[in-house]
Amino acid sequence: EWCTYYGGLFEDWISQIAFDENNSLLMVGQTSSQNNIATIGAHQVNYSGGLYDGLIVCFDEKGVRKWATYYGGSGSDIFAAVQYHQQEFILAGITSSKTNIATPGANQTVHGGGVSDCFLAKFDQQGLRLWSSYFGGADLDGTYPGYPTEIYLGITLDQDGNIFMCGTTASQFGIATEGTHSPLYQGGKCDGFVAKFNNNGSKLWGT
């Protein structure tokens, strides 16, 4: 029924899309364009720097843009996944930025170290950020060592809105919790991980 380009003068990538109950579409990804991206009054109207900023765009059911925003700090920021639940969008990505990512009181307000951390963010249908949190340790999270542009990260939600994030990590601390399948890093260049968060972004467990 419709199709559209979306982007500016430089590279623009879309990673995933999700729909709400009104058939509005939210697409997420990354951009290095400094024009034709964000809408007036959006969460972040200007490009922040680094190789990429995260990109969030919402269209209505006819393909008309409702709102769009950059997301990120002075490092590189990439959205990899998005899910919808009860009038809210949950987004996941990776970042090397030390600022402009997490909200006060979040599960992890400080970048864990290394080249990249994973992060989660929640937005409402109007583009208002509700919360955001880093998730990572002192090494690479969400990417493979030696291949920082290859992203291994996904999320899904259960019926109660709990968030499950899976991916890859080289961090030996800050990921797993006691009493889970594997609370210790098992070795090699990276391990897989899965972590559960409640709908407010608090980590319930990780392994």
Named regions from a protein language model:
Residues 1-207:
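A sequence-level/structural motif corresponding to short, flexible coil/turn segments enriched
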